[in-house]
Amino acid sequence: MRTLLPPVGSEVFRRFTQSSLNEIQQKQQIREEERKRTNAQVSEELPEPASDLEAGKPLPFIYGEPPHELLNVPLEDIDPFYQSQKTFIVLSKGNIIYRFNAESSLYLLSPFNALRIVAIKILIHSLFSLFIMATILTNCAFMTLSDPPAWSKTMEYVFTFIYTFEATIKILSRGFCVGKFTFLKDPWNWLDFMVISMAYLTELVDLGNVSVLRTFRVLRALKTITVIPGLKTIVGALIQSVRKLADAMVLTVFCLSVFALIGLQLFMGNLRQKCVLIPQWLYGNLTFDINSTNGYYGNDTHDNGTKSKHLEFEFERHINNPDNYYYLTGQGDPLLCGNSSDAGVCPESYVCLKVGANPNYGYTSYDSFGWAFLALFRLMTQDFWENLFQLTLRTAGKTYMIFFVVVIFLGSFYLINLILAVVAMAYAEQNEATLAEAKEKEEEYIHILEALKKREEEQAARKEPHSTVEGFEDDHRLCPPCWYAFANIFLKWDCCGCWRHLKECLYAIVMDPFVDLGITICIILNTVFMAMEHYPMSADFEELLSVGNLVFTGIFTGEMVFKILAMDPYFYFQVGWNIFDSIIVTISLVELGLANVQGLSVLRSFRLMRVFKLAKSWPTLNMLIKIIGNSVGALGNLTLVLAIIVFIFAVVGMQLFGKNYKDCVCRISEDCVLPRWHMNDFFHAFLIIFRVLCGEWIESMWDCMEVSGQTMCLIVFMMVLVIGNLVVLNLFLALLLSSFSGDNLTTQDDEGENNLQIAINRINRAMSWTKTYILLYVYTLTESNLNQHFAVSDDEEQRRVKDILALTSVSSDKLVSHHCGNDFFRVPIAEAESDSDDSDYDEDKDSQCDESSVCSSVQKPEVQEEEMDENCVAKTPTDCWTKKCYSRCPFLDIDTSQGRGKIWCNIRRTCFSIVENNYFESFIVFMILLSSGALAFEDIYLEKHQLIKSILEYADKVFTYVFVMEMVLKWFAYGFKSYFSNAWCWLDFLIVDVSLVSLTANILGYSELGAIKSLRTLRALRPLRALSRFEGMRVVVNALVGAVPSIFNVLLVCLIFWLIFSIMGVNLFAGKFSYCFNETSQEIIDTKVVDNKTECIALIKANFTEVRWKNVKVNYDNVGIGYLSLLQVATFKGWTDIMYAAVDSRDVESQPIYEVNLYMYLYFVIFIIFGSFFTLNLFIGVIIDNFNQQKAKLGGQDIFMTEEQKKYYNAMKKLGSKKPQKPVPRPENPFQGLVFDLVTKQIFDVFIMVLICLNMVTMMVETDEQSDKKEEVLYWINVVFILIFTTECTLKIIALRRHYFSIGWNIFDFVVVILSILGLLLADIIEKYFVSPTLFRVIRLARIGRVLRLIRGAKGIRTLLFALMMSLPALFNIGLLLFLIMFIFSIFGMSNFAYVKKEALIDDMFNFETFGNSMICLFMITTSAGWDGLLSPIMNTPPDCDPNVENPGTTVRGNCGSPAIGIAFFSTYIIMSFLVVVNMFIAIILENFNVATEESSDPLCEDDFEMFYETWEKFDPDASQFIQYSKLSDFCDTLKEPLRIPQPNTIKLISMDLPLVPGDRIHCMDILLALTAEVLGDSDEMDTLKATMEEKFMANNPSKVSYEPISSTLLRKEEEVAATVIQRAYRKYLLLRTVRLASFMYREKTEGRGKEKAPETTGLLCKQFSQLYGFNKETDEPLQSKANRLGQVELQSEVLLHAVPPLRSSEFLQERDQRETSV
């Protein structure tokens, strides 16, 4: 930008005239001639376009204000880049830059043409943009009309005319398509062109389906992007994100395809298995075949089978009649069933047959690849997957839960979060680039301002009235000067001295910290008062809350008034919090005045905003509000883009499907009334699109496909899901996560203490002072009494007083930090008993060193164990008691050197050696596992198996005795002090106590008491003891303990946020969700019959016993249950029922009417945006960031892996650590050699890959109940593929011999081939002799193994799977922790919910009756799926359940649940699993994805090193690690990019200076390092990489150590060049001497100069030269030939080689060029 600063005195803005155009043309002509003359590209020397002078941006302030007469007229371009091109600029009124071509527009209109100038003026005018924007918005409003009026057609013509006029103006001013800044060169103008073209097409040409074409009009909404400049940028970022999704999308589609194929093979046709009523006339006549569609064999053989045919016809009609299927209450689809042992069973009189259609209109099935793919995609996106899970397990069996576990963990947790990672990374890169650009601009602006200051000084010297900087500052004042004058007069109140004195007094009061404390307490009390509102309330309580509201409103009003008086309005409203206070107080006062006005009760909700005032004194809440504020600011454009996307898809849905919903409504609704989710009008279409953005799309899509056809609905819904949910919302999340770091969620000490902290500190100091003097007074009284009996010296007394004062003067903060530090989490380990006088703290520190303790550590990660190990002996027990205990009870201090004390010491040492023994540790772990496993058997069937019950009772006693024994041994070994100072030992102690109390109660016969039963459920915590014993789980818990403060902070803030929405929900919906219900017909009584509760109660009193006034279980009757409602809405489970009740609600105790309160949907929309999108995603952010902080404190080590797992992780990350392998030798046998050549060619691998793809396609076309012909064709195709792959396997074994099994992929291929052959052979046997379709299906899965071979050839997929492999150790540890949590909650669920009534999602398969069923339910709700359906029956209370009903086989009575326990159980599990543990999965996957992406985005990756060594094998068949120097050129040419150096490459290789070892050989690592440096360049990172690679290679290949280089390629070349130079110089010298001698001899002969001495040296040299290079008289051998024979060896002596300094490569090349030039 410094280059853009115009020189002083220069004319910056010049009109664009004909002479300007001629000047540009002259410059272009000169440049063209120069280019032709020098044959070089002059354009390369031109500067880059200035980013600040781009079209559409405002003119930088450094150019000053352009003269008014130069606005809206063509000017010469001020960008140096364009000054030599045919362009000009126009500045609009707001100094916005517009750039145009100087060429003639449409070959007709020059830049100086009047028409074009008018068009330009219209185009750049702000009113024109506003007019177009208003037109677009009006057009959008018309598009939302589902039933437009007749005159709307006229409006369409008007809109089309306006858009045509806009395009015409653009084309006239810019040109159409030829030139850089013409109309069609801007991609956004393509949109305009397409919109206008489609408008004319639909009017002029009859194209059939007009409704489809009319939807193209919605693209006009995208024109807003072209009008609002900021939107183009964010759309560009979105497009970049989508481009980067390529690999992740490919991997996702591939994995989904594989899973869909597995689902197709395992579950094809299963979901058609239904419970069909057995007709009475068929009993005894037929035998049912469960696998046949007919389902029977006839037993009767009458004449010509007449009766059998009749029965066949009747039976066929019977089983295809939906009325004969079994339906559960409230379900539209019949009950599914299966025929395996663990599948769902049919009720009595029903049989399981495969008949009828699939569930959900037939769209949920695995019957073909397409439907299976849709089902798996639904499973991956976790939309209503609990339904698919239940249907599949009910038909196939519970064993297949494994399939769902794999798909959820791989597909949902991994693949979906890969998309998040890619989008987040794309945003991060863009953000970094923006920040870098901003930093660069900042530096440039500093220089610019310096230049402006100099200019200002010059202007001041010339006495100019206004400088540039002053002008700039004046321009940036917020208000006109008149407003400042008004403010000084009316908003600053300085009347007289007494008024100022009053103000000072008021200021001192309102700014006092204690006043702030009082206001904060009032805010909290006000919030409590608002939260106490509930339904039903007594009149007195309601009056109390009303008075409380008046009081608090008065207090806050008074605070505002006093602050305004104290600070003056001018300064009061300068503070943001004061503005906020004034708004809330004003609304509160308005609400009081309008309290009785109907419909304005929503104003009461604004009082809730006072809660945010807590942020002034609560740093975490303040930071969260700032985060949301920053995010909303950054999300402004993105929100607008999302709104446009939602609008477009809503209009598209309404235009395409709205009419179909109305016409075909009977297909999806029994009473032919539009369902709640439809697209017949814009508002409902908007709700469906918003629901899809929330992740719920499948149910709406089923309805759409049923009424409008499958293809179009699939396309629209998939587009909304991918664009809206996966891209835009993930970008929202990326922006949110980038808005904060973990440091933001901690108190900012730099800002100093706020008033609240000052007030609290004052109170603490006052309390401390009071406490000190009370203690001193008490001490004085007691001492005076004691001194009468004991003589105490004054010095000792003074020392005690000082101790008391010192103790009490410690602040509470320090006391807390001392007692709640990391030491509480350390492991107490006993060490040698000592009588030393060290402090307790030092003893604790010394006693916490050994990690072998049974109560293992939950040490925070940042504590380094090495620091503690220096002083540790830890071989003998520590003291039993603390020093205080010994001082208070001296008899505890026993002399351990003699007598009983010595015996006691020996006993302790024996106990210590026992508990420290590894065998004891292993035994205890084994007992923990056994005791935990025993809990799993205590299900509802235990009473039926008395033997197992007896065994479990005895085992429980044994476990209790063993754990008591372990506890006592540890008491003896470690002492009470060490044992009870450790959290894990406390946990052990409490769990043992529970078992002990339970056992004692059983022995005494009190086991049936309610309290004892409740206590027994706590035995479910027994598996927690395993946490400290398994290192993998322990490291995860360590990380979690470190994250707990941040998680708790976010949880607390979320609760505050949700409190506002919960209180608002109570205000809006309390008492309005009830309805009058007919228990017999299971229907709500119509409002025409019963209008409210009073009428319903009257109906009940009139002996209508089947009628009940019921309430929705999850409602807003109080704040507590409101929280539960919000949790269901935030997790999108059960939220639709709550919304339905809300939009149907009228008044308190009134019957609901269908969608009477339609716009209450907006309450839920707003909560989902702020309560779900923001707050729940904060959990992800804080967990990721906290773990990153912990990792940084540990020096970058992974906090989720044990030391052994870190070794695996590092092995996975090794780069370049391979060594050359000896290639498989070509067989000598000619036939084998021929086969070897075939299988090692690349074309062979390509051919096999193509066949694998074809095999995948053939598997995809398989369907349920396909024709016999198709089945036979597919069978033989499968046989052909098996033969081909078997042939491939055989050929490779023949060619590679034993080496075949040394390659992992070959072993995989071999296993797949064997399994395929077994599947082919066993299929017939299984079909003939067994009736086990499960085994048959599992065998067929082997075919899918072939598809996985595609991974071998897909680099991008391998990179992403490599990230997964790196994540496995940490994921395994977190999986273990998740399993432990599920195990504990399963046991707890079995204890409390085993007998609840079967309704909603609890049925005969999904319940808490057995451990297996509990685990299935908990796995389902780990993703939050279906937890509302499991909670609903548990919340049943009489009369919805019967507390006295008998449960067969047990003494337990009743089928009611416990609402309080159920809510606590599910809420806790959702928070622990869904919000914490699952987010830990996400954190690890994102981190390892980043690592893998960085490696794959590097210029070099693992594949390149692999390619290097594969090529090396061809040049070094013996794997000696060396090749000849002569082969180097060919080797480097044979390599593939990026390592390849194509021939001719001799000079390049010489300049790389590769070390040579004896024998002119080069080592592979030296070549690899040199090539790597060539690709990456020289940098510190390169040096580090070199060192790492060399170190790894040396470790793997010690053979390199014995070879030391004696030279290098560059040195060798330098030696050769030096020798050549010396040879040439020497020959030249000899030749010169020879000429001189010849001249001397000639002169002697002709002139006879006898006095001249002959040059003897020269003569001697000439003689030598003659001997060396002269003619041999005997053979007449030429000079050159003799030189070749003798000279080379003799001249290349060591003296000559080292007589000259070595030349570097550049010097050598220079010298060579000089020599060649001179020659």
From Swiss-Prot:
Residues 369-393, 682-702, 1120-1141, 1411-1433 dip into the membrane without crossing it. Residues 146-152, 206-211, 268-368, 394-400, 533-543, 598-599, 653-681, 703-713, 938-950, 1003-1010, 1067-1119, 1142-1158, 1262-1272, 1322-1334, 1389-1410, 1434-1462 are extracellular. Keywords: Cell membrane, Disulfide bond, Glycoprotein, Ion channel, Ion transport, Membrane, Repeat, Sodium, Sodium channel, Sodium transport, Transmembrane, Transmembrane helix, Transport, Voltage-gated channel. Disulfide bonds join C275-C337, C346-C352, C666-C672, C704-C713, C1076-C1096, C1441-C1456. Residues 1199-1201 are annotated as: Important for rapid channel inactivation. Residues 28-50, 834-862 are annotated as: Disordered. It catalyses: Na(+)(in) = Na(+)(out). The chain crosses the membrane at residues 127-145, 153-173, 188-205, 212-228, 248-267, 401-421, 514-532, 544-563, 578-597, 600-617, 634-652, 714-732, 920-937, 951-969, 984-1002, 1011-1029, 1047-1066, 1159-1180, 1244-1261, 1273-1291, 1304-1321, 1335-1351, 1371-1388, 1463-1485. It is found in: Cell membrane. One of its GO terms (biological process) is neuronal action potential. Residues 834-845 have a biased composition (Acidic residues). InterPro entries: Ion_trans_dom, Na_channel_asu, Na_chnl_inactivation_gate, Na_trans_assoc_dom, VGCC_Ca_Na, Volt_channel_dom_sf. CDD domains: Na_channel_gate. Signal peptide: none annotated. It is a multi-pass membrane protein. GO terms for molecular function: voltage-gated sodium channel activity. Residues 1-126, 174-187, 229-247, 422-513, 564-577, 618-633, 733-919, 970-983, 1030-1046, 1181-1243, 1292-1303, 1352-1370, 1486-1719 are cytoplasmic. GO terms for cellular component: voltage-gated sodium channel complex. Pore-forming subunit of a voltage-gated sodium (Nav) channel that directly mediates the depolarizing phase of action potentials in excitable membranes. Navs, also called VGSCs (voltage-gated sodium channels) or VDSCs (voltage-dependent sodium channels), operate by switching between closed and open conformations depending on the voltage difference across the membrane. In the open conformation they allow Na(+) ions to selectively pass through the pore, along their electrochemical gradient. Voltage-gated sodium (Nav) channels consist of an ion-conducting alpha subunit which is functional on its own associated with regulatory beta subunits. Belongs to the sodium channel (TC 1.A.1.10) family. Nav1.4/SCN4A subfamily. This is Sodium channel protein type 4 subunit alpha B. It comes from Takifugu rubripes (Japanese pufferfish). The gene is scn4ab.
